[in-house]
């Protein structure tokens, strides 16, 4: 059995290409005949699950929904108060990977950045964080919800990142979740601040469904004693910890040193009551993260950024009950990660609902739906 879609001209020239996805290689898993490289974001509409509506990429196959995105952000602010209007809709969301960029599913996702786009990203996240403009001005709640609605995403999880005493990103994310029912928020407490347990209780009372930890941004080793104490507090409160896990290749050397997957085993092993979701599934060290997930039942893998081949490997070898979809929006359009899950599950569609919805719903304690009844 296969899926076919009529040829569509490529946006940057080239020959029309028919997409044909067939299932059933010699292991019984899905195989993508073509394509794995797309000329731009709109070119994903050549896949059988997507189409273009008024120039915007949408999911056209209603069987894909519902979806939960476990890894999203709105604009973050440090040093100065938040200057972006988080509730302002703009005509377009400026993703850090621009919609015009070529997208290669065979590589880790950030390998698709051009030098110019990467430079713009870094400038927007650093100096731009002090302003009310730039790309960050489009990283708002209504823009996120618009993209969700176009793709069948019923919930997106916001992941705020705090630095000691100079940010209130968790406050803004939790406020967004209170205002917008399609948004869920994790909390964030920097491990070195005082009253960690009290702060976690306050955030949980405000609606936090878990805690985000980013060793590279928060400048702390994942196995630091204060980080270990934070994980222990989270486990006692049944708050899953979503960790940025693994080097991504574009961070500072200090960040690369703090995100080596080997450093995550100590907290995982010593805090078995705590659920650890390894963001980006270990990034460029996917095999090491997959090994942790195979050896420890308190480890989940979140797929944002991974190549199509790595998504297939994870779904083949990991416990499919502990794998979740994430996009890392607004770094990337939410459709990119969905497309990889759909392509990786051709011929084993029973895994789709687990990865796209059921597992995240269970982790977040959401009510049962028709997809996990």
What are these regions (language model features)?
Residues 208-213, 220-324, 371:
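Catalytic pocket-lining loop regions of alpha/beta-barrel enzymes
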Residues 44, 150-243, 247:
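Active-site gating/metal-coordination segments in enzymes
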Residues 12-13:
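Glycine-biased, low-complexity coil/linker segments
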Residues 68-70, 159, 186-187, 276-279, ...:
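Active-site neighborhood of phospho(di)ester-bond hydrolases with catalytic His/Asp-centered motifs
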Residues 18-66, 80-84, 88-132, 139-146, ...:
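Mid-to-C-terminal alpha-helical segments outside catalytic/metal-binding sites
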Residues 198-208, 213-230, 248-251, 257, ...:
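Ligand-binding grooves and catalytic loops that recognize ribose/phosphate and carbohydrate rings
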Residues 71-77, 244, 280:
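Histidine-centered divalent metal-coordination motifs
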Residues 71, 148, 234, 301, ...:
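Conserved, mostly hydrophobic/aromatic
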């Amino acid at each position: 059995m296969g899926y076919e879609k009529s040829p569509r001209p490529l946006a940057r020239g080239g020959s029309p290409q028919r997409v044909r996805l067939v299932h059933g290689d010699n292991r019984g898993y899905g195989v993508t005949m073509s394509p794995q490289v797309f000329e731009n974001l709109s070119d994903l509409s050549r896949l059988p699950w997507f189409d273009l509506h008024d120039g915007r990429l949408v999911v056209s196959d209603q069987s894909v929904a519902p979806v939960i995105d476990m890894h999203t952000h709105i604009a973050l602010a440090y040093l100065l108060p938040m200057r972006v209007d988080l509730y302002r809709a703009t005509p377009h969301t400026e993703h850090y990977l621009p919609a015009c960029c070529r997208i290669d599913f065979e590589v880790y996702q950030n390998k698709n950045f051009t030098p110019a786009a990467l430079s713009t990203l870094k400038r927007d996240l650093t100096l731009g964080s002090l302003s009310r403009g730039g790309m960050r001005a489009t990283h708002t709640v209504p823009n996120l919800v618009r993209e969700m609605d176009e793709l069948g995403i019923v919930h997106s999880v916001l992941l705020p990142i705090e630095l000691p005493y100079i940010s209130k990103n968790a406050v803004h994310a939790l406020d967004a979740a209170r205002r917008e029912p399609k948004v869920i928020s994790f909390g964030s407490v920097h491990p070195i601040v005082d009253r960690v347990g009290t702060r976690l209780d306050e955030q949980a009372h405000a609606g936090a469904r878990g805690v985000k930890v980013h060793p590279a941004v928060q400048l702390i080793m994942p196995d630091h004693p204060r980080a270990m104490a934070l994980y222990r507090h989270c486990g006692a409160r049944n708050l899953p910890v979503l960790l940025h896990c693994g080097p991504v290749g574009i961070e500072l050397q200090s960040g690369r040193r703090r995100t080596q997957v080997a450093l995550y085993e100590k907290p995982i092993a010593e805090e078995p009551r705590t659920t650890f979701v390894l963001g980006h599934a270990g990034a460029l060290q996917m095999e090491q993260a997959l090994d942790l997930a195979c050896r420890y039942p308190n480890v989940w893998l979140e797929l944002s950024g991974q190549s199509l081949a790595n998504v297939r490997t994870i779904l083949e070898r990991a416990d499919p009950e502990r794998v979740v979809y994430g996009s890392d929006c607004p770094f990337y359009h939410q459709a990119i990660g969905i497309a990889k899950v759909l392509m990786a599950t051709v011929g084993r569609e029973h895994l789709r609902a687990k990865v796209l919805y059921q597992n995240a719903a269970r982790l977040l304690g959401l009510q049962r739906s028709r997809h996990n009844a």
